[in-house]
UniProtKB/Swiss-Prot annotation:
InterPro entries: B30.2/SPRY, B30.2/SPRY_sf, Butyrophylin_SPRY, ConA-like_dom_sf, Cytolytic_pore-forming_toxin, PRY, SNTX_MACPF/CDC-like_dom, SPRY_dom
Spans annotated as Structural FAT domain: 265-384
Oligomeric and partner information: Heterodimer of alpha and beta subunits; non-covalently linked.
Domain comment in the entry: The first domain (residues 2-265) is structurally homologous to the membrane attack complex-ferforin/cholesterol-dependent cytolysin (MACPF/CDC) pore-forming domain. It makes numerous contacts with the FAT domain and comprise essentially the core pore-forming machinery. The second domain is structurally homologous to the focal adhesion-targeting (FAT) domain (266-385). It makes numerous in cis contacts with the MACPF/CDC domain (first domain) and the thioredoxin (THX) domain (third domain) as well as extensive in trans interactions at the SNTX-alpha/beta interface.
GO MF, one example: toxin activity
Tissue: Expressed by the venom gland.
Posttranslational modification: Intrachain disulfide bonds may be present in the heterodimer.
Protein name: Stonustoxin subunit beta
Length: 700
């Protein structure tokens, strides 16, 4: 080992002939040589060595990258241990995929130009000794350099579904293989088929090279143009050191430090595997951080960011220790068991790779549970607010009579195992509280809680579908509450929380309802249908208001009432619905099947005078009456001439109820009991030409 000539990759480092090098930590020692510049120049032989080649790989492993750059195992270990700072094209070694679920293909262009070497018979006769010479920690001298240049075009897809990574990678590789033979037209545009263009538009390009470019390529088309120009850019003056030959210093100075030993291949493989496994965990963490669900839950985002930082810190400490051990082994102060012990200690720590991957599995499960719930909830189109200040501002809105809030109650930024990792980083000699995350510390590791959360999400969605109105607002948020497992549907009435496990609105019997808010659960916004309105009715305010008494030219429409001064609403209703209207004059409000007559002057076309319609009517002459199938019954009202009428349709129960509305309270007036067979349309009678009375209504 001490007398062996070393051959190492330059990796963008500024090697020159005669330069000193410490192979124990793979460091250049600039500013010192064994010979004067004139002697080196006179003793240098140069031979032409032109070559060029390209290679394509679809791997991101350190081994494959090192193979492209002709890096041997010992130097690779130094790089992984952080001993070597690379430059130029070798920065490609530091370029790692951000996401695990990402396709990558790399194109390498490699060229050599010349080989320079110092004459082997130079010996020690021209060595310039000095007082500083004895203190220089160099093990080798540079005696040969192969010049040339490397260029790497790194093509990355966007983050994709894990099942598509290989397929997309294959498509990318097939197109990139064509780069060396792609033709460029006179307009310098790349000639590709339509399908190939679609593929290339979906990925990005990053360039690492020993060539000076005014701008680096970022797209496939840029990469093709740059690749075509590289051979013309290659020349003697543009070449950089690529491979370096080193002679031990002891050949010139017997007291020089020596490279006594190096780690065996199995140990170096452990270095690589351990560090690459941590990188894989970090990519997995990046995948999670990029998930849209994580962007919603700041607590989950915080945990993942903390975990990522912890892994970074652990990696840095591990690399620093590996660097020290490599130097000690190469200096002969320790044997390779020192590195072996380091990895054994790592296996017995909470930072063993199995534990790190287990934590990520738990966190990915949490994200999957949250995503599955959000997929259900978003179909209800709720306001998703994870800032509690903004949430309560929304709850205090005067328009919000009722609010249902789906609350994730177990989402928290606190994590027992992250605390263990942090404590071990601070005190690596201490005994860790646990070596791996425990399922009992994670609520989502049990099936029953996520299942209940999804059941509540479906309930919430169905409630939103049933009560999609102005008075009931729906929110989604996260409020940590260990006493409520998984999630709850919290009910707020006029900003006050009433219950935290809501299932359905409390509705008294229709005759006993007194609180207006109970009816507003089923608030329904209606619009009058101008195509049904009798010709003397004038609609305004967005077809919310109708007034009788105006004469206008008759129009013939199949849906229009020709004899009775009536108008219907645009949509048929089933389910539960409540609406309010201001009314005055001679008016009636009710519902009808769509098939009510329109053109006759008989009862078939008159609201309340047939089996198809139900009407609550008011006139100053007759007072209040309920009418169905021509049967009239007077209704006693405590406040004659009230202005605000409420109507509640419970289609499934077969009831249609009318209420006098007074601010926060309602007074029951009458309820029709029947069995509805089809959707009903709110409809109104407004004025009577024969009695020469007018009326008006306004939907609220």
């Amino acid at each position: 080992m001490p007398s062996d000539i070393l051959v190492v990759a330059a990796l963008g480092r500024p090697f020159t002939l005669g330069m000193l090098y410490d192979a124990r930590n793979d460091k250049l020692i600039p500013g010192f040589t064994l010979w004067e510049d004139e002697v080196i120049e006179e003793s240098t032989l140069e031979s032409s060595q032109p070559s060029s080649a390209f290679e394509i790989i679809a791997s991101d492993s350190t081994d494959d990258k090192s193979s492209l750059m002709d890096i041997e195992a010992s130097l690779k270990a130094s790089f992984l241990g952080g001993l070597v700072e690379v430059g130029g094209s070798a920065k490609y070694l530091n370029n790692q995929k951000k996401f695990k679920n990402q396709s990558r293909v790399t194109l390498q262009y490699k060229a050599t130009t010349s080989f320079k070497q110092l004459m082997t018979n130079l010996g020690t006769k021209h060595v310039e000794y000095s007082e500083l010479f004895e203190n220089i920690q160099a093990t080798h001298v540079v005696i040969g350099i192969l010049y040339g240049a490397n260029a790497f075009f790194v093509f990355d897809s966007n983050k994709v579904d894990s099942t598509n990574v290989q397929e997309i990678q294959g498509q990318m590789e097939a197109v990139i293989k064509k780069i060396p033979s792609v033709e460029i037209s006179g307009k310098a545009s790349v000639q590709l088929t339509g399908e190939e263009t679609d593929i290339t538009n979906s990925f990005s390009c990053e360039f690492h090279g020993d060539f000076f470019l005014t701008t680096n390529p970022t797209t496939f088309e840029d990469a093709v143009k740059t690749y075509q120009q590289l051979p013309q850019m290659m020349g003697k003056d543009n070449a950089v050191p690529m491979t370096v030959w080193l002679v031990p210093m002891v050949n010139f100075y017997s007291e020089a430090p020596q490279l006594m030993a190096d780690s065996s291949t199995p140990i170096l493989r452990k270095v690589r595997n351990t560090l690459e496994a941590i990188v894989q965990v970090q990519m997995r963490c990046n995948d999670a951080l990029d998930d849209p669900t994580v962007n919603l839950f700041t607590e989950v985002q915080k945990k993942l960011s903390d975990f990522q930082k912890i892994c970074d810190d652990h990696m840095s400490k591990l690399q620093a220790t590996i660097a020290k051990k490599l130097f000690a082994i190469r200096s002969g102060d320790e044997d390779e068991s020192a590195l072996l012990n380091l990895f054994e200690e790592n296996l017995q720590s909470p930072f063993n790779i199995e534990s790190l991957n287990m934590w990520m599995e738990f966190e990915e499960r949490e994200i999957n549970v949250l995503r599955s719930c959000m997929d259900i909830l978003t179909k209800a189109k709720p306001k998703v607010i994870f800032n509690q200040g903004v949430l309560f501002k929304g709850l205090y809105d005067s328009k919000v009579k009722h609010a249902l809030c789906y609350v994730f109650t177990n989402v928290t930024k606190n994590d027992v195992f992250l605390n263990v990792l942090n404590e071990f980083l601070d005190s690596p000699q201490s005994r860790p509280k646990k070596l791996r995350p425990s399922p009992k510390d994670y609520w989502y590791s049990y099936d029953d809680i996520p299942e209940t959360m999804r059941e509540k999400a479906y309930l919430f969605r169905n409630l939103a579908k049933e009560m999609n109105n102005r008075c009931v607002h729906f929110f989604v948020t996260a409020i940590h509450n260990p006493k409520q497992e998984g999630a709850g549907i919290h009910y707020y009435r006029e900003s006050i929380q009433i219950i935290d496990e809501f299932t359905k609105p409390y509705m008294p019997g229709v005759e006993s309802i007194k609180d207006r808010r109970e009816l507003q659960w089923y608030d329904c916004e209606l619009t009058l249908d101008p195509e049904t309105a009798h010709q003397v009715l004038t609609l305004s305010e967005g077809n919310k208001k109708a007034v009788s008494g105006n004469t206008k030219s008759p129009t013939d429409h199949l849906e229009k009432f020709s004899h009775f001064q009536q108008v219907m609403c645009t949509k048929g209703l089933s389910g539960r619905h409540y609406w309010e209207l201001e009314w005055s004059g001679y008016v009636g409000a009710g519902v009808t099947y769509k098939g009510i007559g329109r053109k006759t002057s008989t009862s078939d076309s008159s609201l309340g005078k047939n089996e198809k319609s139900w009407l609550f009517e008011y006139s100053t002459k007759s007072g209040y009456q309920q009418i169905h199938n021509s049967k009239k019954t007077r209704v006693t009202v405590s406040s004659t001439g009230f202005k605000l009428l409420g109507v509640y349709l419970d289609w499934p129960a077969g009831t249609l109820s009318f209420y006098m509305v007074n601010k926060a309270w309602v007074t029951h007036l009458h309820t029709f009991h029947t069995k509805f067979n089809e959707a009903v349309y709110p409809a109104f009678l407004i004025g009577d030409a024969q009695q020469k009375v007018n009326g008006q209504i306004k939907l609220l």
